[in-house]
Amino acid sequence: MFRGATMVNLDSKGRLAVPTRYRELLNEQSEGQMVCTIDLHQPCLLLYPLPEWEIIEQKLSRLSSMNPAERRVQRLLLGHASECQMDSAGRLLLATTLRQHAGLTKEVMLVGQFNKFELWDEQTWYQQVKDDIDAEQSTQEPLSERLQDLSL
């Protein structure tokens, strides 16, 4: 399980160094094989260990290519999916097109989200956190039943 937000730097080749605390787990889970794709709703990337991505691919394969909305999701997620292998120094090379899509330059936030990571431009991440907190504080919407059951 991945959790927490960590600032990492992209090097001049577009590689990010995976924090040490995740490397052993990623090597155990996927031998360092990862898949990166775009997020459909946020300006970030999604980074999955290969076995977790294969579960997503199975779900995508069950969607109908005859349904325009389902076809769009297949096209966006699969069409942008890029395999990346963690090297012996714990670095992942991110495809240029993916980095451009998410506006990633130098400072990147690696955000653990259970079975995957999100990759955000650092400033965009902090703005998103602010926007999310503001939205939670000002919302008039009733909490969903699942959120009501979430006791912190």
UniProtKB/Swiss-Prot annotation:
Gene3D superfamilies, per the entry: Transcriptional regulator MraZ domain
Predominant localisation class: cytoplasm
CDD domains recorded: MraZ_C, MraZ_N
Subcellular location: Cytoplasm, Nucleoid
A Gene Ontology term for the protein's cellular component: nucleoid
Pfam family, one: MraZ
Keyword Repressor: yes
UniProt entry keywords in alphabetical sequence: Cytoplasm, DNA-binding, Repeat, Repressor, Transcription, Transcription regulation
InterPro entries the UniProt entry points to: MraZ, MraZ_C, MraZ_dom, MraZ_N, MraZ_sf, SpoVT-AbrB_dom, SpoVT-AbrB_sf
Molecular function GO terms recorded: DNA-binding transcription factor activity; transcription cis-regulatory region binding
Superkingdom in the source lineage: Bacteria
GO BP field: negative regulation of DNA-templated transcription initiation
Domain SpoVT-AbrB: 5-52, 81-124
Database matches in PANTHER family: TRANSCRIPTIONAL REGULATOR MRAZ
Description of how the protein assembles with itself and partners: Forms oligomers.
HAMAP family membership: MraZ
NCBIfam families the UniProt entry points to: division/cell wall cluster transcriptional repressor MraZ (TIGR00242)
Assigned protein family: Belongs to the MraZ family.
Function: Negatively regulates its own expression and that of the subsequent genes in the proximal part of the division and cell wall (dcw) gene cluster. Acts by binding directly to DNA. May also regulate the expression of genes outside the dcw cluster.
Protein name: Transcriptional regulator MraZ
